[in-house]
From Swiss-Prot:
F(1)F(0) ATP synthase produces ATP from ADP in the presence of a proton or sodium gradient. F-type ATPases consist of two structural domains, F(1) containing the extramembraneous catalytic core and F(0) containing the membrane proton channel, linked together by a central stalk and a peripheral stalk. During catalysis, ATP synthesis in the catalytic domain of F(1) is coupled via a rotary mechanism of the central stalk subunits to proton translocation. The chain crosses the membrane at residues 7-27. Keywords: ATP synthesis, Cell inner membrane, Cell membrane, CF(0), Hydrogen ion transport, Ion transport, Membrane, Transmembrane, Transmembrane helix, Transport. F-type ATPases have 2 components, F(1) - the catalytic core - and F(0) - the membrane proton channel. F(1) has five subunits: alpha(3), beta(3), gamma(1), delta(1), epsilon(1). F(0) has three main subunits: a(1), b(2) and c(10-14). The alpha and beta chains form an alternating ring which encloses part of the gamma chain. F(1) is attached to F(0) by a central stalk formed by the gamma and epsilon chains, while a peripheral stalk is formed by the delta and b chains. Its main location: membrane. It comes from Rhodopseudomonas palustris (strain TIE-1). It is a single-pass membrane protein. Coiled coil: none annotated. This is ATP synthase subunit b 1. Pfam families: ATP-synt_B. InterPro entries: ATP_synth_b/b'su_bac/chlpt, ATP_synthase_B_chain. One of its GO terms (cellular component) is proton-transporting ATP synthase complex. The keyword Transmembrane applies.
């Protein structure tokens, strides 16, 4: 009975008795239930994590699709704006060229009119000078009715040729 004098033997006997008491009281069921509850809670958390991961993946895919769509739309807007700007610039250039052409034509018309008026004024002045010179020469050299007649004819002839 030396075996009962060993401390390890009593520890082993106490441990077996403790396990027997725990088995009698149903502690193993409580521990198993606690472990089952913990397993279920962990499983629920994992399921929730998977669900959140799937939602995050869907949101990421949606975000990427929206971003790509927004980039395409922005590029389309930029392209449209460039095309509009080029069209407006071309229209403005055409309008400016038309305006300059009309202004040039108007200026040329005014210059031609002024030249014609100046030429007419010079001709009129020359005609008046010629008439005055002819009148003086004829009045000094010819006297009487013949002078008046020649003077009238000469004046009419000079005016007709110069105008």
């Amino acid at each position: 009975m030396a075996i009962f004098g060993e401390a390890e033997t009593w520890v082993a006997i106490a441990f077996v008795i403790l396990l027997g008491v725990f088995a009698y009281l149903g502690v193993h069921r409580t521990v198993l239930q606690a472990l089952d509850k913990r397993r279920d809670r962990i499983k629920a958390e994992l399921d929730e994590a998977r669900k959140l991961k799937d939602e995050a993946a869907k949101l990421l895919a949606d975000y990427r699709a929206r971003r790509a769509s927004a980039e395409r739309e922005a590029q389309a807007i930029v392209d449209s704006a460039k095309a509009d700007a080029e069209r407006i610039a071309a229209e403005a250039k055409a309008k400016l060229e038309d305006f300059v052409a009309r202004r040039t034509k108007t200026a040329e018309s005014k210059i031609a009119l002024a030249e014609a008026q100046a030429l007419a004024d010079v001709r009129a002045a020359a005609a008046e000078a010629a008439v005055a010179a002819a009148s003086r020469i004829l009045s000094e050299s010819v006297k009487g009715n013949l002078a008046d007649e020649l003077l009238s004819k000469g004046i009419q002839e000079v005016r007709g040729k110069l105008n």
